[in-house]
Curated annotation (Swiss-Prot):
Record protein name field: Non-structural protein 1
Keywords: Eukaryotic host gene expression shutoff by virus, Host cytoplasm, Host gene expression shutoff by virus, Host mRNA suppression by virus, Host nucleus, Host-virus interaction, Inhibition of host innate immune response by virus, Inhibition of host interferon signaling pathway by virus, Inhibition of host PKR by virus, Inhibition of host pre-mRNA processing by virus, Inhibition of host RIG-I by virus, Inhibition of host RLR pathway by virus, Interferon antiviral system evasion, RNA-binding, Ubl conjugation, Viral immunoevasion
Start and end residues of each stretch annotated as RNA-binding and homodimerization: 1-73
Motif range (Nuclear export signal): 137-146
GO BP annotation list: symbiont-mediated suppression of host cytoplasmic pattern recognition receptor signaling pathway via inhibition of RIG-I activity; symbiont-mediated suppression of host gene expression; symbiont-mediated suppression of host mRNA processing; symbiont-mediated suppression of host PKR/eIFalpha signaling; symbiont-mediated suppression of host type I interferon-mediated signaling pathway
Originating gene: NS
Record organism: Influenza A virus (strain A/England/878/1969 H3N2)
Gene3D superfamilies attached to this UniProt entry: Influenza virus non-structural protein, effector domain, S15/NS1, RNA-binding
Taxonomic classification: Viruses, Riboviria, Orthornavirae, Negarnaviricota, Polyploviricotina
Amino acid sequence: MDSNTVSSFQVDCFLWHVRKQVVDQELGDAPFLDRLRRDQKSLRGRGSTLGLNIEAATRVGKQIVERILKEESDEALKMTMASAPASRYLTDMTIEELSRNWFMLMPKQKVEGPLCIRIDQAIMDKNIMLKANFSVIFDRLETLILLRAFTEEGAIVGEISPLPSLPGHTIEDVKNAIGVLIGGLEWNDNTVRVSKNLQRFAWRSSNENGRHPLTPKQKR
């Protein structure tokens, strides 16, 4: 096992612990809490894959971070912060829409790269809007937190979510998954639209519906 893979996991575990303390002291906002929950699932998956105990990894991660901070000068920290690009968090969904449980009458699930796509195939002849919460950097989608498909009545009929066991995804992964979701919904004569945020940062298209033409694979 690569030593850098292990040390990266250990540091991530400790930093997650620090962020959890921030939430416990009620200092974190909704996007901060969303990322914390998503990263918790990711760490569990990575720990299982690596065969490492999260509690033990957190202790070692603390030692690594403390050693780095001891060697870090204030001036170097200022320069690092000034040069690092800042990401933005965009929210199409409310906390209620993001956390709501939903059920499928005719469930279909497909894995597309590091993303899981779920569609209720019982939904027909509906107007559907895709909404997502995600971060943006350099004017492009950085990390998808969650994407959901809503009917005009507010029912959830589809979803795209990152797989905890496969952390990390690209904008192309997200585009492909959106194409599969749209294709599955349109198969049952539903009309699908994409939110303005998704159109701008993740689904850049040239047609009048704000979408790329779907490939035969995505239409299935």
